[in-house]
Amino acid sequence: MHITPREQEKLMIVVAADLARRRKDRGLKLNHPEAVALITYELIEGARDGRTVADLMSWGSTILTRDDVLEGIPEMIPDIQVEATFDDGTKLVTVHNPIR
């Protein structure tokens, strides 16, 4: 099986997001990489589910709250940008202040 670098990156996001989700479900606060991975994964999947770029940009800031992450993490992530695959092609989704 041959996996392209882009596919490999997506798989790493899925694994990191899965770990973050399990830790969050256990009541643990997420660190920087976990928070970024979880939000990124949800945005990518939202695009595949048929949501619009505008919808994802506003929804992306509701995925995690300050209570879900370690102290100082929201300030470390001023925005998240991800190239997501939509029905009509790949588009850049930017979420400003994703953790509020």
Swiss-Prot record:
Gene3D superfamilies: Urease, gamma-like subunit. InterPro entries: Urease_gamma, Urease_gamma/gamma-beta_su, Urease_gamma_sf, Urease_subunit. This is Urease subunit gamma. Pathway: Nitrogen metabolism; urea degradation; CO(2) and NH(3) from urea (urease route): step 1/1. PANTHER family: UREASE (PTHR33569:SF1). Keywords: Cytoplasm, Hydrolase. Its main location: cytoplasm. Its EC number is 3.5.1.5. GO terms for biological process: urea catabolic process. It catalyses: urea + 2 H2O + H(+) = hydrogencarbonate + 2 NH4(+). It comes from the Bacteria. It comes from Corynebacterium glutamicum (strain ATCC 13032 / DSM 20300 / JCM 1318 / BCRC 11384 / CCUG 27702 / LMG 3730 / NBRC 12168 / NCIMB 10025 / NRRL B-2784 / 534). One of its GO terms (cellular component) is cytoplasm.
